[in-house]
């Protein structure tokens, strides 16, 4: 039989509440020596001990609600609104339940804006990932969790107090209710939930809901065929409450992609903290629990994870060349993430059999580095601080893991878990995080580094085997690794930024903000805090009596989409939107960029190569890809980015690269023909979709609408989305989309085929075989499935475009180096590459860059690059 780890996930909020009422009739009997009520603590402990003995989990996580306000209350303000006040006697015990859990060696977790259900659902899905081997048991008092049952996950619902549970599996759910897990969500959507205070459909209870689902299969199918129902009050209610039914469906659906900051490693069961737990039992008056604890401990106290021992040698000085083999791994440790500002604190190298660690950084100058590492780019930059130029390695475990799967992070602890290459504590456990980051004792530091080397060495063979099986080994050797070297050079070079220019722009913005503030006060008739959503809501919706768009638990929504809908109704709203835009530029980009300028007068951003699902690059510290360009105040920020002396900035931008990729992979003859003949693709689309015979008759508005259709289709836009973007009716938008597919049938065929492929394989690929998993492609929930289908359609397009850009950067770097040009790559932003070019090289470099980028890959249509130069990034764009 397959040996699986056992993960126990407990809905702490739900179970603790039930524990409180399980012994509520005896509440006066359960008091600590200091007078604290302990009935909930005692009952929770009893339940937990019973579960631990029965299930014998290897991993445990107890999730709690973080508060009343969640993303669901933003969707529906009255969500859980009808609940009675939480008893004070229960509320006072909750912190002690959490303290007890910690002392039992069990992890608990809560996440702002999310419920315990979402934390559990997210971890449950993590446990279903490839190369992860868990049986999952979920314990809760909330039936919503039933939607999570599957072949690996069972849900136990507490029935009476905390002693009796009803176990749900897919077979039991089908036998008991005639439903699949996905249909259970639709049942909640129809009948509502009085506990969570959402209504569903008027007068539809469990019996009627079950009948409807057994007939129609799903909520979506029911509403697609609602006209087939015979005339009745129920039919009227279904039609009248359609919007609420689908909202209830969303409210009932557990978010399995919550942004939790823990992984399955964090749920590994630790030993009990016997001394601390014994003292806690004394404080609570739990003599029986203490006696059992001490009997189990047998005088031995431990709170450490049981892990295998590891041998390593500490190197302090002397020659190390004989200790380094080419096929070893090496790893450089820093405290912080921004390696442009951090120094190496220790390093390690070796293989699964022999590992060396050291804090003597001078030894690095004598090292012939091995050919395997983790995060080559980071290492290249760090070693440049020591005037060491690290040669390109043959294997980077971080990049290999990223290519294999983008659904998890790429930390070494994650690699250890996924590729079964040993136990590794997380960096947060060793170093802390945030303001509490600090170096541990040398013994702890050295062991942690040694374990990293061992994990990497053991994982490499398995990772390479998977890359070969997926036909992705070339992506590592020919694309991601060479690109890492190019990006490292770009980061080290940096781009010059004028602080004076930023300060001048900042002064202009402050004047505009002051002027706008006065105008807003005049239009509002009084002064108020424009940055306060609460005060702004009162002004707009109470004083000025503008129509209320959305309402949240804390008041009126003043989100951008709400204000945009109101802009035509009052001049003050337009001024507020303008104020917000300029204020955002001022705080994020003017004030935010100045501290990022290094002593050399440059900004050295960090390119994140292993983050996005599509393969696109992103940048941090600072993020230079998000500088707003639609607003003039945002574009002006680029005036501060300047070339080196006697040079210009050259901006080379791929023209409509994603549409060209779409033409290639769809094979649509009309789209291909338009690009081959150099036609303006948006004008061409306007003619074909809007029935305009001559190009000269296409108006600017026609072209703008056609552009929205072209790019909307790439992102799988709906008729609703297109109607909103263009300010037209949904009927007209639907007609545009249908006509588009009639005129470009190859695109329609591509979209149908790629969705079918995603359903069959569970993933889609770029032209270079870069994979993106589409886990929700077969989801029963219409909205979830629809998003997955749009992702499947867009990912090969966006990912292939990203790959082309990477190839161009690699080839361009090679060309510059081969001919000893002084010109340097500086930035990569979206589809644009920016170079610093000495004036004497300008003519030659412009030809070289354009040719290199346009010949990066051969498509069915030509690639086109637009070039501009300037004394600032603003001028070059």
Swiss-Prot record:
The keyword DNA damage belongs to this UniProt entry's keyword annotation: yes
Gene Ontology MF term list: 3'-5' exonuclease activity; 5'-3' exonuclease activity; DNA binding; DNA-directed DNA polymerase activity
EC class of the enzyme, as a word: transferase
Entry keyword set: DNA damage, DNA repair, DNA replication, DNA-binding, DNA-directed DNA polymerase, Exonuclease, Hydrolase, Nuclease, Nucleotidyltransferase, Transferase
Residues annotated as domain 3'-5' exonuclease: 308-468
Record flagged with keyword Nucleotidyltransferase: yes
InterPro entries listed in its UniProt record: 3'-5'_exonuclease_dom, 5-3_exonucl_a-hlix_arch_N, 5-3_exonuclease, 5-3_exonuclease_C_sf, DNA-dir_DNA_pol_A_CS, DNA-dir_DNA_pol_A_palm_dom, DNA/RNA_pol_sf, DNA_polI_exonuclease
Domain 5'-3' exonuclease, chain residue ranges per copy: 180-270
Swiss-Prot/TrEMBL catalytic activity: DNA(n) + a 2'-deoxyribonucleoside 5'-triphosphate = DNA(n+1) + diphosphate
EC number: 2.7.7.7
Task performed by this protein: In addition to polymerase activity, this DNA polymerase exhibits 3'-5' and 5'-3' exonuclease activity.
Subunit structure: Single-chain monomer with multiple functions.
Cited NCBIfam families: pola, PRK05755.1
Family (UniProt): Belongs to the DNA polymerase type-A family.
Protein name: DNA polymerase I
Record organism: Lactococcus lactis subsp. lactis (strain IL1403) (Streptococcus lactis)
Upper classification of the organism: Bacteria, Bacillati, Bacillota, Bacilli, Lactobacillales
């Amino acid at each position: 039989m397959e040996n699986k780890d056992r993960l126990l996930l407990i809905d702490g909020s739900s179970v603790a509440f039930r524990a409180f009422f399980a012994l509520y009739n005896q509440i006066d009997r359960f008091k600590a020596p200091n007078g604290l009520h302990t009935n909930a603590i005692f009952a929770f402990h009893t339940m937990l001990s019973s579960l631990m003995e029965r299930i014998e989990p290897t991993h445990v996580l107890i999730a709690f609600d973080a508060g009343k306000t969640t993303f669901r209350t933003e969707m529906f303000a009255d969500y859980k609104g009808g609940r009675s006040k939480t008893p004070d006697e229960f509320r006072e015990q909750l912190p002690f339940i959490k303290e007890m859990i910690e002392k039992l060696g069990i992890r608990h977790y809560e996440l702002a804006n999310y419920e315990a259900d979402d934390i559990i659902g997210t971890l449950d899905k993590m446990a279903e990932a490839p190369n992860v081997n868990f049986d999952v048991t979920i314990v809760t008092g909330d039936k919503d969790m039933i939607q999570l049952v599957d072949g690996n996950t069972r849900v136990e619902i507490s029935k009476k107090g905390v002693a009796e549970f009803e176990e749900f599996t897919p077979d039991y759910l089908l036998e008991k209710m005639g439903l699949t897990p996905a249909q259970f969500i639709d049942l909640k959507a129809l009948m509502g939930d009085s506990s969570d205070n959402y209504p569903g459909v008027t007068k539809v209870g469990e019996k009627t809901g079950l009948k409807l689902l057994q007939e129609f299969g799903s909520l979506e199918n029911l509403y697609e065929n609602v006209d087939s129902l015979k005339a009745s009050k129920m039919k009227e209610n279904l039609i009248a409450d359609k919007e609420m039914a689908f909202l209830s469906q969303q409210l009932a659906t557990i978010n399995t992609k919550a942004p939790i900051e823990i992984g399955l490693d964090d749920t590994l069961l630790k030993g009990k903290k016997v001394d601390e737990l014994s003292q806690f039992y004394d404080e609570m008056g739990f003599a029986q629990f203490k006696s059992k604890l001490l009997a189990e401990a047998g005088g031995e106290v431990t709170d450490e994870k049981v892990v295998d021992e590891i041998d390593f040698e500490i190197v302090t000085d002397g020659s190390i060349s004989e200790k380094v083999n080419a096929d070893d791994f090496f790893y450089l440790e820093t405290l912080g993430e921004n390696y442009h500002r951090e120094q190496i604190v220790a390093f390690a190298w070796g293989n699964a059999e022999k590992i060396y660690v050291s804090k003597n950084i001078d030894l690095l100058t004598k090292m012939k580095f091995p050919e395997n590492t983790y995060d080559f780019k980071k290492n290249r930059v760090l070693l440049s601080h020591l005037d060491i130029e690290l040669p390109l390695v043959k294997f980077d475990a971080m990049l290999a893991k990223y290519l294999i799967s983008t659904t998890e992070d790429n930390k070494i602890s994650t690699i250890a878990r996924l590729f079964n290459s040993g136990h590794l504590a997380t960096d947060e456990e060793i170093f802390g995080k945030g303001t509490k980051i600090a170096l541990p004792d040398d013994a702890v530091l050295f062991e942690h580094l040694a374990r990293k080397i061992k994990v990497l060495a053991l994982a490499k063979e398995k990772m390479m085997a998977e890359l070969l099986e997926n036909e992705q080994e070339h992506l590592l050797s020919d694309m991601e690794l060479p690109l890492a070297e190019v990006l490292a050079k770009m980061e080290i070079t940096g781009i010059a930024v004028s602080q004076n220019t930023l300060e001048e722009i900042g002064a202009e913005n402050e004047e505009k903000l002051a002027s706008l503030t006065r105008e807003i006060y005049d239009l509002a008739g009084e002064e108020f805090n424009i940055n306060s959503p609460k005060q702004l809501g009162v002004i707009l919706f109470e004083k000025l009596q503008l129509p209320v768009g959305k309402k949240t638990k804390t008041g009126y929504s003043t989100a951008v989409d709400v204000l945009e809908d109101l802009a035509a109704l009052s001049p003050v709203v337009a001024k507020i939107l303008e104020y917000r835009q300029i204020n955002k530029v001022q705080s994020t980009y003017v004030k935010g960029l100045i501290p990022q300028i290094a002593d050399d007068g440059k900004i050295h951003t960090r390119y994140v190569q292993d983050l996005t699902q599509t393969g696109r690059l992103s940048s941090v510290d600072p993020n230079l890809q998000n500088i707003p360009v639609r607003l003039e105040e945002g574009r002006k920020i680029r005036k501060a980015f300047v070339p080196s002396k006697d040079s210009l900035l050259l901006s080379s931008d791929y023209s409509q690269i994603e549409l060209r990729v779409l033409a290639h992979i769809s094979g649509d003859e009309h789209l291909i023909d338009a690009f081959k003949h150099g036609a303006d693709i948006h004008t061409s689309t306007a003619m074909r979709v809007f029935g305009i015979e001559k190009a000269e008759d296409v108006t600017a508005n026609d072209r703008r609408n056609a552009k929205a259709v072209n790019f909307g289709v790439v992102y799988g836009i709906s008729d609703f989305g297109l109607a909103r973007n263009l300010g037209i009716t949904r009927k007209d938008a639907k007609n545009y989309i249908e006509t588009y597919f009639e005129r470009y049938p190859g695109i329609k065929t591509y979209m149908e085929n790629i969705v079918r492929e995603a359903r069959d394989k569970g993933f889609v690929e770029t032209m270079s075989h870069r994979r993106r998993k589409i886990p929700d492609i077969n989801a029963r929930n219409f909205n979830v499935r629809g998003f997955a289908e749009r992702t499947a359609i867009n990912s090969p397009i966006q990912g292939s475009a990203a790959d082309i850009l990477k190839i161009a950067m690699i080839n361009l770097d090679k060309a510059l180096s081969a001919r000893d040009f002084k010109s340097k790559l500086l930035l990569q932003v979206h589809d644009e590459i920016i170079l610093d070019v000495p004036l004497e090289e300008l003519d030659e470099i412009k030809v070289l860059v354009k040719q290199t980028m346009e010949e990066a890959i051969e498509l069915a249509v030509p690639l086109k690059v637009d070039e501009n130069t300037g004394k600032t990034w603003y001028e070059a764009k």
